[in-house]
């Protein structure tokens, strides 16, 4: 949860510096989101995330670097190739459905 909060704060700072265009904070939702990940079975269940589910991505094993690529709209972002809203898209290996 600390990693999620730290990522959220960094992205917020990037937005204030003009380096990340869109930011929707997930602060205060970390525990509920991590609980959701732990309650479901990876590899069996599917995850339908929304734009504030940063902790779900971290809980499923997405790297902070991959998450940051989406916020700064760079190629290589694993969910949508940085073509959609940050923290939104699909990832077959993690069971994330768009």
Predicted segment positions?
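Mature N-terminal segment immediately following signal peptide/propeptide cleavage
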Residues: 1-3
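Cofactor-binding active-site loop characterized by glycine-rich and histidine/acidic residues
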Residues: 6-9, 13-98
């Amino acid at each position: 949860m600390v990693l999620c909060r730290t990522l959220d704060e960094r992205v917020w700072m990037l937005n204030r510096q003009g380096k990340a265009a869109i930011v929707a904070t997930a602060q205060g939702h970390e525990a509920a989101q991590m609980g959701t990940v732990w309650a479901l079975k990876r590899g069996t269940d599917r995850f339908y995330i929304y734009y504030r589910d940063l902790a779900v991505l971290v809980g499923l094993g997405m790297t902070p670097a991959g998450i940051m690529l989406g916020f700064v709209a760079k190629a290589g972002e694993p969910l949508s190739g940085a073509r959609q809203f940050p923290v939104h898209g699909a990832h077959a290996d993690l069971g994330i459905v768009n």
